[in-house]
């Protein structure tokens, strides 16, 4: 067929092919398929053309009828020779196209029977019998090709309804309304009005309410149909609506003016009232429509359309005002439902006016239903903000009054409805709140409802209420999240190690105020990141992930828990590339689980940040942002703020603002085991005092992780790995603050953040964990203002953490500040077994950078910059692998080479020690820490020597070598440092395991703490501290400098890890006041050249108990304890060969002194014999001494160094110096020494933490013996090895100042020693002779009067005699008052000389508290230590470091006799070994050696059982000590453990800023541990009174008759107890009360009313043994109930009090007042408490409080709802209404009680109380600003 269609051939061909395909498909479906196209005349037949032609002619039938086939043949151009062409076409059409035509053209049903029963196909059967509608449909293809519209109007069912309603046909309308009624019911197919909103209009039109607009149906429905249907809806509405205002809504415009008033009147008279009911046609139809609208109003999608339809609103208003009851109810219900979406028009609109009219009418009604609906409508209207202005203006006061009146009715529903509307109204702002407050008694009623119980409504009332629980996806937001303890999620569940579990427990310290739970999404993302990691080959069940998340949230009591949907969204966020697949689970009957592909569970979960802290504006917020790249390890999700594994109680510490001088440093703690820590805000409360060395030691801040930290906050961060056997290399980044040039404030010089990561493996001693207290270590030197040290303790199972030291760029050398990096594990414990097993255990040795690295780095670093920063040498990380030792726990430190501090930095310190500086102007200390070469050693040189040599002192080429390897020694880079100040970089030592005991970290911590303390303690101290590190060298150098040139260091035994352990162990906490880092001496001694001539103290740590001190083959040159500024060079009575005194130290407590010696050549080294030569310069408080003396060379043993003479190995020996020198150096306090000597036993004890208790404090009663005698490590041995008086911090105590105690001056060195740790150095001159050493002239003059006082940490130590004055007689609390700052360290009579000093030194160390160590110098212990006599070295102390306060627990170590003499070393912050009580006990006896014992403290448990040993009246000594200066920075807190009834309180020196509660926890734990190991000994008599140091007020020592001034406290202990009647078993232990009662509750009532009344409460708790902490009264009441008035606590207090009373009676007569020479004692500085401390205390106690009235029974849902809503209303009123606040003030007391209850509404009430105060203050501020 030629172009028959006129279409182009290609198009035609395409259509033809498409037709053929369709035709084939058609036949195939019918069972008559064809393959070949028929051919006619030799050509294929065009079936498409044939079909088209036939259908155009009318189809097969028409063509056949008209016989038109011949015509068609012609059109196909068949050859004429084909005679039968027409017939053939017809047959082919029949065969192929007829059926197709029949179905597709005519639309007939295909009635063809299935193939197999073919019907005879007759032409007649093809005649169509139906019409084919398909012929009219145009295919989309054609429609598109012809440009026709493709938008179809798809009719839906709603159109049918609309058309039915429009039709007006009665049946259709009824049908449509019935359908609408059914669809409106709640079901799967709720009517959706948006599909055709006209339905509403038509439904309303059928009820006689018409739209006002044109085109409404009023004419049709209202008029035309009324005639046809006899339905008059207008009349209906007029009949049932009586309110004339509402009748206007009835639309009857036409009839309105026709009717006259007369007709209405007649009609009302004669027309019967409408009979409403089922027979009322109009009424029923209106009711039907009202039901439909009400049902639709419950669907959110329909509410907006209904609320926006003004016709609907008119209908509802008419219904609400009708007297057709059912209709009115439906109308009000619907109005209430749509009110929330109803936007009111301006009030001049009729509908808006009528809305308020309706609400008012309902409220004033007498009908309960109407009242409730009226309040519901009003409350919902409040939800739209735009309605607020209208509501506030047009809801009158009468309505408010009516609403409030509902609250007084005993109707649950009415009360709840009323509260709901009041809450919504109060959200509107001050207008509504003021109107509510103006209603009489409204506030009173609401306050009553806050504590109302729904049961008061009676059982019937509640029965009528049906409770429907709606599961909420998120938790109630109304209740404030009460911060639970900030717990680290112990994700490391697989680590079942004790330490880890313990950590969790310990973590429950209440979070600081301002800590807020992080939002749910962030937490979920962190949790996912912490528990899972990307791994394309693994998959995890998604359901399991979510269930684990829910479990974690449940354990943490988190407020917001994500739904599964929200959780999976977080999953997609954290792991964007994961996929999901279904996995059949064969175990669960083939049920499929959804698995997340590409994610696997972490073997070691990361820490999670649960809270963030809103930093007070005042403090520089130190935000540690996670620095992901810090460590090779993935960034940790977040290191928890709180102590992690180590249950450390971190005190929130104010971070001082040192920002001015500091440059930001990065502190990164990359730890392998830890992923980069998510950034967290370090919780460092701002420290108000910046640059105030006095500031309390900042509590340790936990920095979540590496982030640049402003140097301003100097932090020593200790990351402690409490992981059994894991060595965690730590990265340390130390940022030296830029040198602070301020000359005046040395302490401020560059407080640098020091991050010390101490990785410490807890070797199977979870108990050590408690030690975390050391974590508080602050680097005193660093930040005068009291830099918090952050300690991050993480338990990592055997994972190695790589330590990296990051050089802190330009931060001043950390050391310069005298900051001590303390790598102190909070856990001091190392067991002897550990030592023994050290090889097997993770190596104790911390491997510092491999030696090769070390050497190069050191030189490079040192030379590289003048800044003394620890630099990571070459940034190399030493891998543990570097150490052959198998012990996995090795920690590798990168080489730390302190760089010389630029002179500018040093300047502050220099200024402080101008005198010294000249000598050591070039001094620069370089600490090189390198791995010992002998990696193979089990105890690979666990101890690295830290030699801080001032370049000046050392030969230029000499480097102090910390490395265990000798190679390192050569590094001369330090010499370049000389130009820098004497800043000594802090060396960090970490033993791999840190001896697996906390000790090394502890040491470091102690050091840092001491320093900080120094800074804090005395103004001079800051300089000293600064100097301590940097200047220390100066001071030390000054003192030692002459000798420094050759500070030879004996070689410590390289392998002796136990020595290292010992060294480390003693440092329980940041005990070293000046503590520099103590690096355990490497096995290889530094080259001799490194030695400076300065005296060296060699601590010999022997694993053995052997008392012998090996002189490490060191030159006689005395080693200084460089750690502290005041270096006491005490000539040893028996200088070890080589002239270096080696003090065997079981527990090298010396560490407390800045272990890093600042003296030019001082080197700590441990000989293979476990000897460690340590130069300790007491940094801590010695700054003061330095200041005062300028360069006094006093070696004051940092308290941390407790070497008890008794412990031969532990003894600290100071080489004899010329007398003059010794005098200078004598300032050191005696070490009270724990006998931490090398006894294995002790070591074991220490490891276990028992050592404190076990150590016995021996006081040599023979002063004479003392000299020659050294206490062996046991302290029992009265070996004279310690011949030289134990040096406090390397100074002998045997200076002349001591002589009185020494029957003869033990050592010729009668030169006065000023015991100064952190405090102005005071010389203890014999007989009060000014003991200024040559180098101590500056302070000494001031101190002259005070010479007798030993200043420790700025605290005067009592000289021997004076020390004795402090007697245990003083009640603990008194003691705490006296020693309150922990600054007084009575020094035992020097007669006890070296031994005593050693003991005291140890004690000092132990006792040293980060904030200020108290040096309790038990004269006796110090004396005894040197003596053979059973001198009780107070070795036990050495182990304890109390981060928060010095604990001088000279606990009996090995020494059999536990002498009470306890030295609280001013510096030592040694955390108290568990149970150790470090008591600063002045020895009651005169300094005389024998008397030294007088105050023996049996402080095993921290209880001071000290018997006061009456010392021979060594009153000269007393005279020498005019008084004990009070250190502002420290207070001694007596902590009693209510659980240990047998233990007396532990005295702890607490830094001023520290939270005593934290200290108390640590101390109690320590005491508990000790107690387990040893019977408690009581040292009650630690009552040295701290008097302001400057005035050097006399210290009262109770029990010392010689005391010139009676200690104020002493009286109380001496009071006769009130008469005790039968049955009275509980005594009030309030100061001077002692009344007996029958029950604990009576004691509590008595104490709360008699001692805690408004008029009598003194501002702090004076309970015996309680710290003098300023408390708000409510906080005190809570504290009293929790801590003192429980049955256990009272019994424990009685047990402690009994021995105390006896001791007090003995010593009361002996308590002389020390030193009238000092000016009147300055009032002890009030401990600065956090502004929210009271609230925190209430929070902590609230869990224990019992409010029987409303918490005995669990709150029911109704009760909870009423209380919570009432509380929210009160909160809003307090927030917005001034009038309301005035009225609320009356109820503040009641609300306060409720706010600390367990009610659901308690947190809301707390917010209400907050609004009462905060809003007033803010308004006052606004007024002030406006005035300005």
UniProtKB/Swiss-Prot annotation:
There is a cross-link at residues 7, 15, 119, 555, 1695, 1710, 1725 (Glycyl lysine isopeptide (Lys-Gly) (interchain with G-Cter in SUMO2)). It is found in: Nucleus. Residues 987-1011, 1267-1283, 1295-1320, 1366-1379, 1390-1400, 1419-1428, 1491-1503, 1567-1586, 1702-1714 have a biased composition (Polar residues). The modification N-acetylalanine is found at residue 2. Residues 824-843, 962-1028, 1245-1339, 1360-1462, 1483-1503, 1566-1618, 1697-1726 are annotated as: Disordered. It holds the Pfam family ARID. GO terms for biological process: cardiac muscle cell proliferation; chromatin remodeling; circulatory system development; coronary artery morphogenesis; embryonic organ development; heart morphogenesis; homeostatic process; negative regulation of cell migration. The modification Phosphothreonine is found at residues 653, 692. Residues 1012-1028, 1453-1462, 1594-1614 have a biased composition (Low complexity). PANTHER family: AT-RICH INTERACTIVE DOMAIN-CONTAINING PROTEIN 2. This is AT-rich interactive domain-containing protein 2.
